[in-house]
């Protein structure tokens, strides 16, 4: 499979970046910056706090989900059976975070080295969710506590 790569010049930034349309449907934007000592990557999904239903491509009907599920998933995706994503990033020297807005959930990291290893961590944990009944209940409690504070 080939990837469609397009160079785009931004007059606002007076700089160029590349858009890669991956066969999986993922859109990748790359902006190389010569002379910079750190790198940054963000994986964004079009699923945010206002999304309470979705439709899978292999199903006819919509699936309804509780409010707060995007924020819940934002937290859960960092977990794994062995070593959570934050611990994995610490081994590469990267710093990671995530946020949920109305329309998006985004996972990101910055690093001064080991970019490829850090990118592999990002792509791994967002595509390999780890759920157990115990960890789901724990996270539900944390999200519930945050809602009661607001």
Predicted regions and their residues:
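N- or domain-start disorder-to-order transition segments that initiate the globular core
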Residues: 1-38
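A generic short-segment signal for beta-strand/edge and adjacent turn/coil regions
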Residues: 8-14, 74-80, 90, 128-130
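Domain-wide signal for the mature, well-folded portions of proteins, strongly enriched
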Residues: 23, 29-30, 108-110, 146
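M16/MPP (pitrilysin/insulinase) zinc-metallopeptidase core fold and M16-derived inactive scaffolds
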Residues: 42-117
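M16/insulysin-pitrilysin zinc metalloprotease superfamily fold
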Residues: 80-81, 109-145
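Conserved small/polar residues in nucleotide/adenosyl-binding loops
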Residues: 149-150
């Amino acid at each position: 499979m080939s990837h469609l790569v397009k160079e785009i010049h931004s007059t606002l930034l007076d700089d160029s970046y590349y858009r890669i349309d991956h066969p999986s449907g993922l859109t990748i934007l790359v902006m190389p910056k010569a002379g910079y000592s750190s790198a940054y990557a963000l994986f964004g999904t079009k699923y945010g706090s206002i999304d309470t239903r979705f439709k899978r491509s292999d199903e006819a009907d919509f699936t309804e989900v509780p409010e707060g599920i995007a924020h819940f998933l934002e937290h859960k995706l960092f977990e794994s059976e062995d070593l959570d994503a934050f611990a994995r990033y610490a081994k590469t020297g990267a710093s990671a975070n995530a946020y949920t807005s109305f329309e998006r959930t985004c996972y990101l990291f910055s690093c001064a080295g080991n970019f490829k290893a850090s990118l592999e961590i990002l792509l791994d944990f967002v595509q390999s969710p780890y759920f157990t009944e115990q960890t789901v209940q724990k996270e539900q409690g944390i999200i519930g506590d945050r809602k009661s504070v607001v």
